[in-house]
């Protein structure tokens, strides 16, 4: 399951990547596979291991904290099905999109299209108690281990992980970090398509936007934080 998870990451980022399943494979035999082939490899691998994994919450303290469990696999399969039109398109510059109704999966013996598959795996998550939280912010609070929405979170328990807030300062702009009296790396940034998708700059901004991003003018002690060039 972990191998499939990391193949998902690189397929999503790069598209065509080599499929290597043995450390003994000679380097000169490592060649790129089409994105659709990598997609099917990931789906098949996740479906094969799903029934072997415990039906436990990965975001709660205990033996399975931070580990890939069955709900994590179901969540990832739902995500793969939801984006199947993209992942099954090997000629993504030809202007001819794929059709999710014509991309099929076998789930519990049923032949389902991509949209039906996504719903099926989301239903599996709902059956074991996952649901959207009434307060979106709670998912990101310090004590969010009882969130009914979080499925696969970064383990940051203060008693187990000394680097628990690194991801916070890594996401801030250098000047924000300095103005707030802390550190920063300017690592995670939103691109134009992200802010537009959230309605930034319009009268219909997604209510979650301000909870996920620093945007616009940020003030500290009543003074705007400026770029180095003003």
Features from the language model and the residues they span:
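Structured, solvent-exposed acidic/aromatic patches
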Residues: 1-169
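Elongated scaffold/linker segments in the mid-to-C-terminal portions of large proteins
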Residues: 121, 126-230
């Amino acid at each position: 399951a972990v191998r499939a998870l990391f193949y998902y990451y690189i397929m999503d980022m790069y598209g065509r990547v080599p499929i290597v399943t043995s450390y003994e494979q000679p380097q000169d035999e490592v060649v790129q596979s089409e994105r659709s082939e990598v997609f099917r490899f990931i789906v098949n691998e996740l479906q094969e291991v799903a029934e072997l994994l415990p039906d436990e919450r990965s975001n709660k303290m205990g033996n399975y904290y931070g580990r890939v469990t069955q709900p994590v696999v179901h969540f990832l399969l739902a995500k793969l099905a939801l984006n199947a039109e993209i992942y099954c398109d090997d000629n993504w510059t030809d202007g001819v999109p794929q059709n999710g109704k014509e991309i099929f999966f076998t789930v519990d013996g049923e032949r389902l299209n991509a949209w039906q598959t996504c719903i099926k795996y989301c239903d599996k998550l709902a059956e074991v108690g996952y649901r959207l939280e009434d307060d979106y912010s709670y998912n990101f609070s310090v004590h969010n281990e009882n969130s009914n929405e979080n499925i696969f979170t970064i383990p940051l328990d203060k008693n187990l992980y000394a680097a628990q807030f690194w991801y916070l300062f890594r996401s801030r702009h250098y000047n924000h970090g300095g103005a707030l009296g802390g550190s920063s790396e300017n690592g995670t940034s939103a691109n134009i398509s992200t802010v537009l998708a959230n309605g930034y700059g319009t009268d219909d901004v997604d209510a979650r936007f301000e909870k996920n991003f620093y945007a616009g003018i940020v003030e500290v002690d009543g003074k705007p934080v400026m770029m180095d060039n003003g």
